[in-house]
Amino acid sequence: MLPSHKQTISQLLSDAVGTLLPEGTNRPEIVLERPKQAAHGDIACNVALQLAKPLGTNPRELANRIADGIRADARGQRLVSAVEIAGPGFINLRLSPTARTDVLAAVFAEGDRYGAADLHDGAPVLVEFVSANPTGPLHVGHGRQAALGDALAALLEWQGHKVHREFYYNDAGVQIHNLAVSVQARARGFKPGDTGWPEAAYNGDYIADIAADYLAGKTVRASDGEPVTGARDVENIEAIRRFAVTYLRNEQDIDLQAFGVKFDHYYLESSLYADGKVQQTVDALIAAGKTYEQEGALWLRTTDDGDDKDRVMRKSDGSYTYFVPDVAYHTTKWGRGFTQVINVQGSDHHGTIARVRAGLQGLDLGIPKGYPDYVLHKMVTVMKDGAEVKISKRAGSYVTVRDLIEWSNGDAESEAGVDTIRACVESGAPNWPGRFTRGRDAVRFFLLSRKADTEFVFDVDLALKQSDENPVYYVQYAHARICSVFEQWHAREGGDAASLAGADLAAVAGPEASPQAVALVQRIAAFPDMLADAARELAPHAVAFYLRDLAGDFHAFYNADRVLVDDDAVKRARLALLAATRQVLRNGLAVIGVSAPQKM
């Protein structure tokens, strides 16, 4: 139901209950639920069952008295057509035609902002996601993070937050050294399997590409950095490192462009060392008495804050363990004014949560114990041509986001092994990401079609199907189908959707409306609450679930009630319902970064 209706009905029930309570008694919280069976009405409330024992009253009798209060109230008479008592004392309400009409009127009035709320008055939130090491192409796990993080950020924006999207680059440490050594070996003419090929080297074809461009003196640049030119010096490992990191950051920028994801800031791990923030964090923890020395290593007392054992911060060789810069990084988030932070990461990072939080607590900066929040996702398995794909020629050991977008786009060139995204970038094609809209839409929607904490199988063959089996096609087809109806109406009668705002909606919202029409209106009414719940629970998958349900309700209505009928009032009412459905489909798809095509 509409949030305004929910608030009114909650207050209505509370007021009815209040008249039955002894003076000075606190009113209980009113919880409204949707009955599991449509035959039981639109809203269910168990407040009579909650109060019966404290008041020493039969719950059905109490429910009937509450129902009488609702029926006698003018607000109830406007929004509620029937109040029924079920079972031991459940109060079931049926919404009135007026309430259903209000839903469609709200969609017409609010348009592209239907479902949005200003609940948080611009309160800042930082969402960190993807945060890949610049040691290779983005893999499908990063793709899941990108889909989850960007949709979550949009959800929070729709609830009135000012959202800051951040990518943290782990550009320091052993893995970056291994990258530089790998490129150096390629530049010297070695390849994987050769004697002299480094044991910890990266084996993908991209390493050879980096080496070739370095030796050719090419210039590369990440979106937020300075250009770096290949020095051609095979012995200069630092020059190789700088070139390789910048090269791969640029490659990841291209993947993110194709995926339609933009970040407000890229934060480099190396800057934490350069600015002295890592050392400052360690010094502060030592000064606070949160550390101790043992066997030549520095330990953090993480058990003081709920960890199962204390953790090493500085190893005996003097190097820091990987969670130490993470603690320093999160102090910068807090210091920049982000009192709410959400990290989207793979489930393999679960072990670092307690360590980072313990480090933050040890610094005594006033940071809450549950800071930051985490959304952890499980792995993605890719299926293609009926078999699991484990290796990418491009990456060497995993399927990349670029692979997935190109395959799901259905390009013959990609099937033949051509890197079509790279080809578009190098040719300078204008608006090149638009060419990959189909692939991007499929990857984004699919990666949101399961809860983050469940493993997901991405079936490329299914993503290419133009049938109801394909969830993104099913939802987008609903939007395109509605657009087609409006094209027909315009061609026949010159009809314009804008003229439907004042239509008589009795045929879809009144007592004679079909069950399919009523169900569709109810689904549209649920959109604002769904967005609010998804944002509160950090659950962007709920939007994809909702869109599939909305598309299903639309298709059921369309198959049951012919739209372009001779009766003008009925036709306009049904067209108004289609216009509202199209708007909500468009809004929901916008939240998750998927297009709403007019033709398919």
From Swiss-Prot:
Q: Name one GO cellular component term.
A: cytoplasm
Write down the chemical reaction(s) this protein catalyses. tRNA(Arg) + L-arginine + ATP = L-arginyl-tRNA(Arg) + AMP + diphosphate
Q: What is its EC number?
A: 6.1.1.19
Q: Where is this motif: 'HIGH' region?
A: 132-142
Q: What class of enzyme is it?
A: ligase
Q: What's in the keyword line of the UniProt record?
A: Aminoacyl-tRNA synthetase, ATP-binding, Cytoplasm, Ligase, Nucleotide-binding, Protein biosynthesis
Which compartments does it reside in? Answer: Cytoplasm
Q: Where primarily located?
A: cytoplasm
Q: Which GO terms describe its biological process?
A: arginyl-tRNA aminoacylation
PROSITE patterns, from UniProt? AA_TRNA_LIGASE_I
What molecular function does GO assign, one term? ATP binding
Q: Could you say which protein family the record assigns here?
A: Belongs to the class-I aminoacyl-tRNA synthetase family.
- Provide the assembly information: Monomer.
Q: What is this protein called?
A: Arginine--tRNA ligase
